[in-house]
Every structure is written in C-alpha cells, then in structure tokens.
Swiss-Prot record:
Record-level GO BP terms: coenzyme A biosynthetic process
The family this protein is said to belong to: Belongs to the GTP-dependent DPCK family.
Chain segments annotated as transmembrane: none
Keyword Ubl conjugation among UniProt keywords: no
Organism this protein belongs to: Haloarcula marismortui (strain ATCC 43049 / DSM 3752 / JCM 8966 / VKM B-1809)
Gene Ontology MF: a single term: GTP binding
Protein name as it appears in the record: GTP-dependent dephospho-CoA kinase
Pathway recorded for this protein: Cofactor biosynthesis; coenzyme A biosynthesis
Annotated positions binding GTP: D43, V45, D62, E120, D143
The keyword GTP-binding belongs to this UniProt entry's keyword annotation: yes
Catalytic activity entry: 3'-dephospho-CoA + GTP = GDP + CoA + H(+)
Job of this protein: Catalyzes the GTP-dependent phosphorylation of the 3'-hydroxyl group of dephosphocoenzyme A to form coenzyme A (CoA).
Amino acid sequence: MSDVVLELPSDLRHELKEPLGRIYTDTAALLADAGDPIIAVGDMVTYHLIEAGRTPDLALVDERTERSAVDADVAAAIDGFDRTLSVDNPAATLTADLLAALRDGLDSDETTLLDVDGEEDLATLPAVLAAPAGASVVYGQPDEGMVLADCDDTARDRVRSLLERMDGDAERAIALVSN
C-alpha cells in the first residue's frame, strides 16, 4: 500500500485549473524562455520536449494522457534518460515515494525519468517548490498547451498554499522535497 502524504480534496480541484505560468503551444518558444534545469510533468510534455531536442533533466510520466493510454510511438520516444525510477502514486494524491523520488531526481547529475504507476499530475506542485531558483517546471494544460512555471517566490508561495490546503501532512510533504 502506498504511503499517501497528501490527497486532493474535491473543493480544491477548481484552483488547480488556473495555470502556474504562461501557456505555450510552440515547444521551441517555450524552450527559448525556459530556465535550467527543466522538470517535465506528463507524457505529452516530455514527448514534445524530447522531440524538440531537449531531454528534461527530470521527467515524470504515467503512460497516460487525459486519462487514456498514450500512443505507442509517444511511449517509445520517451527514452534516452540516464536512469529510471519507478514509484506508485494513486490518482489525486502525493505519496512519500513520489516526493522522495522527485527530490532524488532533482539532486542527481543524471537525467532521470520517474515512471509513475498511478497518476503524476499533482507532482507539478512539489516540483515547483523543490526545484532550484531559475528552474522551470513544464506541464500540460488540457486542450490549451504546455505551461511553463518559473520556480520563483511567487510560484512557490502559491504552491505552498495549495499543498497546505490539501488533506494530509503538508509539513511532511514539504520536508520530503526540501534539500
């Protein structure tokens, strides 16, 4: 059984629809504006970055997009990482394993693919909190494009507020991703 640290309450879901940054439909334009390192959350975002010639420093994938399996060619293209870590993370949750693996991936000098059994969507929040200054977290905004979230104080404050309003132990979640 997964060690769930935080769970998304239904009354908070609407706030997650508001993007944490600018929305892009052009990968090259996004990459021109992105900081370093780049953390990708989602299969399609990871695929588009790789296809544009930029393997993310850390990518979190679950082999699904908008609740359907990704195409075989997309899954096959998500390759070329120095290492792969696998974790369980049920939908609408953040588990201790996912949070610890996120921190591990950020601390590594190797590109890391975090293969999530379950759902990786909420990982955007702790990724913004945990990433170093100047980093960018890229994630998908359904039917709109890719969001480029800068890891600055404004974004971190918003993310911390969201995590603190989730059900569970926000202090533990924040501690697991802090360095």
